[in-house]
A protein has these predicted regions:
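N-terminal basic, Ser/Thr-rich segments that initiate or prime the first beta/alpha elements at protein or domain
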Residues: 1-329
C-alpha cells in the first residue's frame, strides 16, 4: 500500500508539473512576443527621432545630408571620396518594400579617444536616405550621384549547387536551430538518466524537488524543441532566399554584388575603385565547381571587402579577366 501511495503521489506531481510547465511555456512565449513588439516600437521611435527632418542635397561636387530632431547631425562628402552605393533592406524593410540608401566613403583612421558614435558613422558611411521605397532608388541616385547612373543590369546568379550548399551551411553547420536541438537532446538524455536514478532509488528527491524537476523537464524539452524548429525553418527560408536572390554583375564601368535572404544588401562600386580582387575556394567548393568572389575598396577606415559565396567557376574566371588591366574594353 505504501509503494502504491508513493507511486500515486509521484504521478500526481508529474501531472501537476506538466500542467504548470504548459502554463509557464505559454506565459514565456507571450512575454517574448510582447517584448519583441515593444523593442520594435522603441527602435522605430528611435529611428524617427534620430533621422527626423532628414535632408539630402547635391552642391557642386559635394553631397550633404543633415538630420536629427534632438541632436542635429551634418555630414558632407566630396564625390571623389565616394567608393560605393549600398542598398540595405532589413527584414521589416523588405516586408514594407523600403530600403536604406547609403554611400561607402573613405575615412581616416579614428583615434582611441573618438566617440562610439563617430566610429559607427565611419563604418556605415553616409546615409543619403534612411527609409525610401525601392522603386525610388534610381531617381535618388540620379539626383545625388549621377556618376553611378550606369550600373550593370545583367546579373549573374550564384551556381545552381549553391542552394544545396546554402541550406547545409545555414541550417546545419552554422544553424542555430539545429545546434539548439542538439543541446536540448543532450539535456533530455541527462534528465532521463536522473529520472531513472530517482525511480531506482539511486537519487533521493523529495516531492518539491521532483515537482521542480518535472517542470524543468517539460520547459526545456517542449520549449527548446519548439524554438529549435522555428529557428531551423527560418534558417532554411533564409538559405533559399539567399540562393535565389544573390548575384553579381559588371559592365565596362561598374560592379554590383547582391546578397539576399531575409535581409538583403546590394553594393555597387566603380571598377576603378577596386583596390584588390580575387577568388578563393575550399576543397568542397572545388568539388562543386564554385568560387568565392572578393572585391576590396577603400571604403571605411581600413578598406571594405565585398564577398559573394558560390559563384560558378566559369563566371568567376570571366570576372577575373574583367579585373585585369584593359579587361573592360
Amino acid at each position: 500500500m505504501g509503494d502504491a501511495a508513493d507511486g500515486a503521489v509521484e504521478s500526481a506531481l508529474v501531472f501537476a508539473g506538466s500542467q504548470a510547465s504548459a502554463y509557464l511555456i505559454g506565459a514565456v512565449s507571450a512575454g517574448i512576443i510582447v517584448l519583441v513588439l515593444v523593442l520594435w516600437v522603441f527602435s522605430a521611435l528611435g529611428s524617427y527621432i534620430g533621422y527626423g527632418g532628414f535632408k539630402a542635397r547635391r552642391r557642386n561636387n559635394r553631397i550633404e545630408v543633415e538630420y536629427g530632431l534632438l541632436q542635429h547631425t551634418f555630414q558632407g562628402i566630396d564625390i571623389d571620396r565616394v567608393q560605393s552605393v549600398v542598398v540595405k533592406q532589413s527584414f521589416i524593410r523588405r516586408l514594407l518594400g523600403y530600403c536604406e540608401l547609403s554611400l561607402g566613403k573613405i575615412d581616416a583612421a579614428t583615434g582611441e579617444d573618438s566617440s562610439n558614435k563617430q566610429n559607427t558613422l565611419a563604418n556605415q558611411g553616409i546615409i543619403i536616405h534612411p527609409f525610401v521605397k525601392m522603386n525610388r532608388v534610381p531617381e535618388i541616385l540620379a539626383g545625388l550621384v549621377p556618376e553611378f547612373s550606369d550600373l550593370p543590369q545583367q546579373a549573374k546568379p550564384v551556381a545552381k549547387v549553391a542552394l544545396r550548399r546554402a541550406v547545409l551551411r545555414q541550417s546545419i553547420w552554422f544553424g542555430g536551430g539545429f545546434w539548439l536541438a542538439v543541446v536540448v537532446t543532450v539535456c533530455l538524455v541527462v534528465f532521463g538518466w536522473v529520472n531513472g536514478e530517482v525511480a531506482t532509488g539511486g537519487i533521493e528527491l523529495d516531492s518539491e524537488d521532483l515537482f521542480l524537476l518535472s517542470i524543468g523537464w517539460n520547459v526545456i524539452v517542449v520549449g527548446g524543441y519548439a524554438l529549435a524548429a522555428v529557428l531551423f525553418i527560418v534558417d532554411i527560408v533564409n538559405a533559399v532566399l539567399w540562393a535565389r536572390e544573390s548575384s553579381f554583375a559588371y559592365n565596362h564601368r561598374f560592379m554590383q554584388v547582391s546578397n539576399g535572404g531575409l535581409s538583403r544588401e546590394t553594393v555597387s562600386f566603380p571598377r576603378q575603385k577596386i583596390q584588390f580582387g580575387c577568388t578563393k575556394s575550399n576543397p568542397l567548393q572545388r568539388r562543386a565547381g564554385t568560387d568565392t568572389l572578393l572585391a576590396t575598396t577603400a571604403a571605411g577606415s581600413g578598406g571594405t571587402t565585398t564577398t559573394l559565396i558560390d559563384a560558378s567557376h566559369a563566371d568567376a574566371m570571366a570576372w577575373l579577366d574583367w579585373l585585369k588591366p584593359g579587361g573592360n574594353q
